[in-house]
Structure formats: structure tokens, C-alpha cells
Amino acid sequence: ISEGLLSLDDKLVDMFPEHCPEDPSDNLKEVTVKDLLTMTCGHSTDPTYASRTNTEVSWIRLFMEHPFTHKPGTLYCYNSLGTYVLSAMVQKVTDQKLVDYLFPRLFRPLGINNVSWAESPEGVNTGGWGLFLKTEDLAKMGLMILQKGQFNGCQVVPAEWIESASSAQVPCVPAGMNSDDADK
């Protein structure tokens, strides 16, 4: 996003018209990069399991066919498949797999030299799972986040992005409660 290749307002249906259902819902038509990043795309259930057990259909298509029961941006629902779709977006606009795109921008500046990421049957890094690295390398990522995007005096990730990524985006169930507790 900071390089201008994607914007928070880019729409999913514009990025992948070839995977769009024949008659997309109004909610699907409104899903943006921001909605995917904040896991507020409008799904009320996580469609990830269906993708991991189905190697015959595009995972992007499975994501887009899953019911968008809420207006995007209004309901938080943990959604690993949404992060996969973000990975596919990065691959589409950069012509690089996410792991390759991030290597010079994130991993190398953190001193992480041995990293791999699981892929879908379509050859897209999974995004929300399957990142393989050493424990101490994961700790470097945590330290960078604690230091507002800096590592060894270098600004690796914009501080504004760290602030936004670690701030509440939509009202949700208080920490430590599940949705059933919130109704009591």
C-alpha cells in the first residue's frame, strides 16, 4: 500500500472479476482491501476450512461464493481465507509471490534469511497460515512491531501502519469474551 500498488479502497470484485460469481451480492461488490485487512469483509463465518479441503476450485472463487451476510466494515469475523485473497492481490499487482515480495522489504531488513510460505494449488502463498521461520526470527518481527516498525535503527514498516494495524477498527466483543458472553 505504501508503494502505491494497492490502495485500501481497491475493490475485490475489480481485482478478480474472473472469480466473481455470476450475480454478486451488493455486499460482495463493496469489499475492499481495508475490509480484508481488518477481517470485516462481511462474512459471518470463516470459509477457510472449505478451501483447505478443496483442491478443485479456486480458493478466491470459494471466498467470493461464501455468503457476505453483513455490510463490509461492520462485523469482525476471523477469516484466514481473506488473508489468502490479500496474498493473491499482492501477487497479481507485483507478479511475485508474497514471500518473494516481502523478502527485500521485511525479511532481509530483519536479518531473516531462511523463510518459506505454504502455497495453494494455484501457487499463491497462503497468507494467513503456513509461514515457516525460526522462533528467533518471529521474535524479531515482534520486536519490530513493539518498536513501531523500526529494527536496528531502520524503519522497516511505516509507524502509521503499525498504529493502524494494532488499533480497534470496528466495535467487537471485549477481549476475553466470546460472542455468546456478549449477549449476557
Describe the role of every protein-language-model region.
Residues 1-9, 36, 86-90, 138-144:
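Active-site SXXK
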Residues 3-41, 65, 94-129, 133:
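Active-site helix/loop module of the DD-peptidase/beta-lactamase fold
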Residues 34-38, 61, 108, 140-143, ...:
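Generic alpha-helical structural context detector
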Residues 28-31, 76-84, 132-136:
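Aromatic- and histidine-enriched alpha-helix N-cap/loop-to-helix transition segments
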Residues 76, 100, 115-184:
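Penicillin-binding protein/beta-lactamase superfamily catalytic region
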Residues 40, 48-57, 61-119:
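Active-site cradle of extracellular carbohydrate-active enzymes
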Residues 7-9, 48-50, 152-154:
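Surface-exposed patches in mature extracellular/periplasmic domains of secreted proteins
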